[in-house]
């Protein structure tokens, strides 16, 4: 399966596309950074945000020399890591027009969506917290690369009117990213039905009697993908497919 984040770089330009990654320590965020590593002539990371994995965020910020950093969590972060993040921002901010920024809490994450230098925001946040980031990104006139299902499940009627132009919003989770790429250059009026694909998770083919004895450990062991705990459970129960159908309704 191709990296879903490759769709972030489908548009060619002589100018580097400057990217903010929200949820940079999660699976989609890590994949996004891998894409940037392979296309340094086309892509540049200028902002990173994570929830609680401050040490991983610091390593990423140092590697990409990022001047804008945000942590969703306000507590439980060691003083050493906080100092390291502050020092990194100070070093990198000398070359940024708007300076640098390091903040904690949801306001800080939302502010990253409005950095003047940013061209594109990858929203790989988990849960309904991603809705505000999607809204702020589109309101600021940035391209939204969306991997956060809840933005559309919770607020599709709020988000979609802000994405009026082609390319304003690019879905990069695997199912919707695949549909998006299949429809490029096609007339939507000629499409009568869309299929949202599914691996079936770890319990595909199991009999009802087997499912009565399922353990949390089994539900957390996906046969194909290494993902976060919540999305892995949603995959095991197929709850994520319900969310994806709602998301596809708004997108397409």
Go through each PLM region and give its residues.
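Glycine-rich beta-alpha junction loops
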Residues: 49-53, 75, 174-178, 195-203, ...
